């Protein structure tokens, strides 16, 4: 059974705000990252999965249940880290995590061990006696994460778990997330750091409230580029257009007087034969290497494509409306 299933799930706030017609299936033991521009609907999607929001239409199932009606045993299998600080500001860091652990029924010996483990993980053990309200914003984020992890849930829903956290600690947290995955746990997280998508098994890109891309990081990279990308340098000006259609080359475009970029079905097949292809077209190859788009580039291309597609759809709809009005007149 899949841990999380959304079928045509929507939450419509009106005036184009919300999430719309989201189809998503998350298998056990998967890290799924939800990325997108600010205001794209990432947090709304997470809150639908937690049951904090009701879908306007469609269906949401989590661990086999409607999240609005979780049995207690199912709820105890879930850890949730909200985007905003929700713990008690008047309790210490230690007391907050201990209290959350007690809510999930952890008995004293195990509870004390787990509280120490998670506070050490997020580098807050030395701050355990400080009131939560006196911690910095970044420390409060880490305290929320510790509280979400303390009862060792099988499903973790993390809204911006590394926001406001320094790069070294982000790496430590990601190491822990991957360790949890290896134990068979399922993790859904949103992130403002697009490069963190590389650490996910599956990436869901949301923009304008719509799921516009879903797949492994490499799949999204190929989708954005149109295939594998190879950068080529020649010893003299060369028109690469003659290479298109040969040896699995989809397109070849100049990037300078003596350089061009190839989009290929398979870079591993194309690179070894490029010398012959360029020579046969009257050129001389200096170097050829496969390059990988950064995830910032992937994100930008896919978002721009989605916005262009949506604008085209809206333009067609407006045109049909105008035509109908003229016919009626």
Locations of regions flagged by a protein language model:
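Conserved ABC transporter NBD signature motif
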Residues: 58-66, 73-74
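Conserved ABC ATPase "signature" region
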Residues: 98, 102, 107-127
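Conserved catalytic motifs of ABC-family nucleotide-binding domains
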Residues: 152
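Catalytic Walker B motif of ABC-type/P-loop ATPase nucleotide-binding domains
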Residues: 156-159
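ABC transporter nucleotide-binding domain
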Residues: 175-189, 193-265
């Amino acid at each position: 059974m899949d841990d999380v299933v959304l079928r045509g799930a929507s939450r419509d706030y009106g005036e184009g705000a919300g999430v719309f017609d989201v189809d998503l299936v998350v298998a056990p033991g998967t890290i799924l990252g939800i990325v997108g521009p600010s205001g794209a609907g990432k947090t709304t999607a997470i809150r639908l999965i937690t049951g904090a929001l009701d879908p306007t239409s469609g269906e949401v199932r989590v661990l086999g249940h409607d999240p609005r009606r979780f049995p207690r045993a199912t709820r105890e299998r879930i850890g949730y880290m909200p985007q905003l600080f929700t713990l008690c500001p008047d309790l210490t860091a230690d007391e907050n995590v201990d209290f959350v652990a007690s809510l999930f029924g952890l008995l004293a010996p195990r509870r004390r061990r787990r509280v120490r483990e998670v506070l050490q993980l997020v580098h807050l053990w030395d701050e355990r006696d400080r009131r939560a309200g006196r911690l910095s914003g970044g420390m409060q984020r880490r305290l929320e994460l510790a509280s979400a992890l303390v009862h060792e849930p099988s499903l973790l829903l993390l809204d911006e778990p590394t926001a406001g956290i320094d790069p070294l600690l982000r790496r430590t947290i990601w190491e822990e997330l991957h360790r949890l995955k290896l134990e068979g746990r399922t993790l859904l997280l949103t992130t403002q750091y697009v490069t963190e998508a590389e650490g996910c098994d599956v990436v869901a890109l949301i923009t304008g409230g719509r799921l516009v891309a879903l797949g492994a990081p490499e799949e999204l990279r190929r989708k954005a580029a149109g295939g594998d990308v190879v950068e080529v340098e020649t010893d003299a000006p060369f028109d690469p257009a003659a290479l298109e259609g040969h040896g699995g080359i989809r397109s070849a475009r100049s990037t300078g007087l003596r350089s061009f970029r190839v989009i290929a079905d398979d870079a591993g097949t194309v690179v070894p034969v490029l010398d012959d292809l360029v020579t046969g077209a009257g050129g001389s190859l200096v170097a050829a290497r496969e390059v990988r788009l950064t995830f910032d580039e992937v994100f930008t291309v896919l978002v721009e494509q989605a916005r262009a597609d949506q604008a085209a759809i809206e333009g067609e709809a407006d045109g049909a409306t105008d035509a109908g009005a003229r016919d009626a007149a």
